[in-house]
Design a protein with these regions (language model features):
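Structural motif
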Residues: 27-39
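Beta-rich, blade/repeat-based domains predominating
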Residues: 240-251, 284-316, 347-359, 391-437, ...
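Conserved beta-strand positions in repeat-built beta-propeller and related beta-rich domains
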Residues: 255-260, 304-306, 313-314, 320-326, ...
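Short loop/turn segments that connect beta-strands within beta-propeller blades
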Residues: 269-273, 334-338, 376-380, 455-459, ...
């Protein structure tokens, strides 16, 4: 047995050595506490000791069109005996060991080993215990004065990133918070004018109070023994300037991921670990940033004229359709030939979430012009559905939103000049969309607290008020019921079109109210709803039949995800899409696969 070195701070590691001639080997870790008792539900992440070794030859990213093997990271959880095993790998590995309430441990064996005996030491420092808690705990405890203010803040200020992580909760003056809010308004937040004035002082004081009084922070719910048997695999994609937004598990077995900020489409083969990058083309003369050129003018590295956002696949020929939110067009990608086709639109602003219906028509929300678009592949023509507005001011703004952004691109700071109310009047924001089995088109409208229905046969539009704030993204289950995220309310909601009844299910969370579920998807064959837990660094699953929850913690802190996709066997995929990427632990965005036993 080796004695612990001072550098490990009393953490005991015993290495049982194997023959040095072994070319590859499996590794088993046994994790105990200082008394020698086994520790269950310990998260152990195995990763290449030399790092991901990514190709950065194309302005920091892989050269396009060249398939390269990427070594994934694998995470598993210890069983009741404290054991966790990893299959053999041909490269040297290191291990990151984590369990709430204990000190993290990083192990980089100097020799090849088949067995590692690891002792984790309980963390007793209240400050360090608080720092290790997920952002959802800090956000849930943050006092902003009243519930309505908190809900409005969570709706507008968790669009792109967490609130409460270590970067956000650091000491800032009210003036510094005011500068941040000013910049976020230009990025697209619609925080009300009154809250732009009031919140800088409250945020500065609120986070300071929590830092100085860690006893005010609740303990998150404990990790479940059911985590044993789950395997999480991560493929590193992009860099700290990337925003790998939505992804698609295609019928060809490959996974496609869009980098919104760098205009790249990643093609990942989960079986071979080979990754190929394709650059999304643009028209000659188009500016960096596209039609939204002023929005990210101060961002350090921005190589995008399209802002690739959401993806959907045709069931007929496997072509992939991509919404470029910074252009007035639809992008089509042929996975067989790798060719892109750009379909130009005559109107609309900010193509957003996309789906393909049973008749091979492509439907997507057009967020800032308050529309839903349909692209008929047979005729190659677009049909635009104008959604109702909440008055003349909103009609005027959505009608001429292109002119507003044109002025902003010329340096006129309209996003900071124009008054904003808590209803975000002027930007109703149609967001998520899905097609029910009967062919009806349903969408969510984030800022009006509504869902809507389009009958493709008649063109009739029906709007339905929701009994909750912030319906963001929605999906249908096998029975045609809709599942909707209540974004600022830490809940999901089921809507039955047959009865017009809403049923709410709160996320299993401590403290209540600290998470912002951005999106969800339904594994229809198994009746499981998967939910993105953006503040809690987790994915939630909800069994529709038993109405029971489970929580799967993700390996990295600051895991902010925006969608879930499935393989036919129910294996789930998501991707770290935090903006900015340098907030993420290790500064690395990844494609994530979750396999359950």
């Amino acid at each position: 047995m080796r004695r612990a070195t001072p550098g490990l701070r009393h953490l005991l590691i015993t290495l049982v050595l194997t023959a040095c001639s072994a070319p590859s080997f499996a590794t088993q870790l046994t994790v105990t506490d200082p008394a020698g008792q086994p520790l269950a539900t310990v998260m152990v992440r195995e990763r290449p000791a030399d790092g991901p070794q990514l190709d950065t030859s194309d302005n920091g990213y892989p050269a396009p069109g060249v398939a390269r093997a990427v070594a994934p990271e694998v995470t598993r959880f210890s069983d009741a005996t404290g054991r966790v095993e990893f299959t053999e790998r041909d490269a040297s590995m290191e291990y990151l060991v984590r369990k709430p309430g204990y000190q993290d441990l990083a192990i980089k064996p100097e020799v090849e080993t088949r067995e590692l005996n690891v002792t984790l030491v309980p963390e007793t420092d209240p400050i360090k215990l608080a720092e290790a808690k997920p952002a959802s705990v800090w956000l849930g405890a943050l006092d902003l004065g009243d519930r309505d203010t908190k809900l409005h803040f969570q709706t507008q200020c968790t669009f792109c990133h967490q609130q409460g992580n270590s970067f956000i909760r650091m000491e800032r003056t009210p003036e510094a918070w005011g500068d941040i809010i000013h910049r976020m308004q230009r990025y697209g937040a619609r925080l009300s004018s009154q809250d732009q004035r009031a919140l800088p002082e409250r945020l500065s004081a609120g986070y300071r109070k929590l830092r100085e009084n860690p006893q005010l922070l609740a303990d998150p719910l404990p990790w479940s023994p059911a985590l044993t048997g789950i395997t999480i695999t991560e493929w590193p994609l992009g860099d700290i300037f990337s925003q790998v937004h939505d992804m698609l598990v295609a019928a060809n077995g490959l996974v496609y991921v869009a980098d919104n900020i760098q205009d790249r489409l990643y093609e990942v083969d989960p079986k071979t670990n080979r990754v190929t990058v394709y650059k999304i083309p643009h028209r000659e003369g188009e500016r960096n940033g596209g039609l939204l050129a002023a929005r990210l003018k101060n961002f350090p590295k921005h190589d995008s004229t399209s802002n690739a956002h959401s993806l959907a696949e045709s069931r007929v020929d496997g072509h992939i359709f991509i919404t470029p939110s910074a252009q007035r067009r639809l992008v089509e990608f042929d996975p067989a030939t790798k060719a892109f086709t750009l379909h130009e639109m005559d109107e609309g602003f900010y193509p957003h979430t996309i789906r393909v219906d049973q008749k091979d028509r492509v439907w997507f929300t057009v967020a800032l012009s308050n529309q839903v678009a349909m692209f008929d592949r047979t005729t190659q023509r677009f049909t635009m559905y104008d959604l109702p507005t909440r008055g003349f001011r909103e009609w005027l703004n959505t009608r001429y939103i292109g002119a507003v952004f044109k002025l902003m691109s010329w340096g006129v700071p309209l996003a900071n000049w124009l008054p904003v109310d808590r209803a975000a009047t002027g930007t109703p924001l149609p967001y998520g969309i899905d097609i029910t089995p009967d062919g009806k088109v349903w969408f969510a409208r984030l800022h009006t607290d509504e869902i809507g229905l389009i009958d493709p046969d008649s063109g009739k539009i029906t709007m339905i008020a929701t009994p909750f704030k912030g319906p963001r993204r929605l999906r249908t289950d096998a029975a045609g019921k809709l599942w909707i995220t209540a974004f600022p309310e830490s809940a999901i909601v089921r809507f039955d079109p047959a009865t017009s009844q809403f049923t709410r299910f709160d996320l299993p969370l401590s403290p209540k109210g600290g998470d912002t579920p951005y999106a969800l998807n339904v594994d229809r064959p198994r009746g499981i709803v998967w939910v993105n837990g953006n503040q809690s660094d987790s994915l939630y699953t909800f069994d529709i039949t038993s109405e029971t929850w489970a929580n799967i913690p993700m390996p990295r802190r600051v895991t902010f995800t925006r969608d879930v996709e499935f393989e036919p066997d129910g294996t789930a995929y998501t991707a770290i899409a935090h903006f900015p990427g340098w907030h993420v632990e290790d500064g690395q965005s990844t494609l994530i696969r979750v396999q359950r036993p």
